[in-house]
């Protein structure tokens, strides 16, 4: 009888507990990623980001040689100090979440409107947008919105994925890129292990 009474009491407490106290994982995940993107927008140095891709890499990015289909990739080069400094900042930002996440850097390509490049991806190699092996790709409307307006945009186009895009500013206040704070509902730790 005591057990039945105790069980009934517990069930009543669960039934009347406010629903807002324990948000759904996707709601919690979205909020944490929005916070990371907000902080990252202030912490990532746009002046340093603009130095990452070297002039040589920019020169060869759109060159096509029928004798060398990997010309652009073979000549991709970065400024080590700028790259490592920014990558460490992005990695630290990803540790602000209570779940596995990544913070990636995307930069528009000067002289090629509508094109964007993932300059740095992080340890889990998660991105809702990046196509493996591509040096650059067409800019998505959500990315254009961030680069044009400076507003953060949350994207959940792929099932189970959440990305929050936020602007990266240089010292003049210009938007020079964007970060993608990203995670997914079910993470497979071995998915990207080659």
What are these regions (language model features)?
Residues 39, 43-47, 93-114:
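Short N-terminal helix-loop-first-beta-strand/juxtamembrane motif that initiates sensory/input modules
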Residues 87, 119-158:
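Extracytoplasmic/periplasmic sensor domains and loops in membrane signaling proteins
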Residues 17-70:
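Juxtamembrane extracytoplasmic/periplasmic/luminal helical "stalk" adjacent to the first N-terminal
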Residues 5-14:
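Bacterial N-terminal signal peptides
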Residues 170-179:
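Short hydrophobic/glycine-rich mini-motifs in sensory/regulatory modules
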Residues 159-167:
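A short beta-strand signature within small-molecule sensing/ligand-binding domains used
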